[in-house]
């Protein structure tokens, strides 16, 4: 799934759980649906969902403001609403930029304290 540029769907997530965890396809589907429902329910209640090493989903309240119709330039009131925000963790940011958590690029080996320098 990684690096292909495709959109990952619920079906893809269920298949990954099936392949990697070993649950049946029915159990894998139920598991994915349960996790997504729990995240959704928490967000509906206004709770922050923090997934370690991944990121945080939170609901933010936006007050009423004045917007502008781009075609006519007419001012239009935009009603107050709640919006969902995702803030990726530092670890996720590093991974999508090809770095490991220690700041090294993926594929680089960490320096060994036992390596001998030759001169």
UniProtKB/Swiss-Prot annotation:
Family annotation (Gene3D superfamilies): IHF-like DNA-binding proteins (4.10.520.10)
Recorded family membership: Belongs to the bacterial histone-like protein family.
This protein's UniProt keywords: DNA recombination, DNA-binding, Transcription, Transcription regulation, Translation regulation
SUPFAM superfamilies associated with the record: IHF-like DNA-binding proteins
Subunit structure, interactors included: Heterodimer of an alpha and a beta chain.
Keyword field contains Aminoacyl-tRNA synthetase: no
Annotated protein name in UniProt: Integration host factor subunit alpha
Organism: Bradyrhizobium sp. (strain ORS 278)
GO annotation (BP), single: positive regulation of metabolic process
Disulfide bond entries: none
Cellular component terms per the entry's GO annotation: cytosol
Upper lineage: Bacteria, Pseudomonadati, Pseudomonadota, Alphaproteobacteria, Hyphomicrobiales
HAMAP family listed in its UniProt record: IHF_alpha
């Amino acid at each position: 799934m990684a690096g292909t540029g495709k959109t990952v769907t619920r079906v893809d997530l269920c298949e990954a759980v099936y392949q990697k965890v070993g649950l049946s396809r029915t159990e894998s589907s139920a598991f994915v649906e349960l996790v997504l429902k729990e995240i959704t329910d928490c967000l509906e209640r206004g709770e922050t969902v923090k997934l370690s090493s991944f990121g945080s989903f939170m609901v933010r309240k936006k007050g009423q403001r004045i917007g502008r119709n781009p075609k006519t330039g007419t001012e239009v009131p935009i009603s107050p609403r709640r919006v969902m925000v995702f803030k990726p963790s530092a670890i996720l940011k590093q991974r999508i930029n090809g770095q490991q958590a220690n700041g090294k690029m993926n594929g680089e080996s960490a320096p060994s304290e036992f390596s001998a320098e030759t001169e």
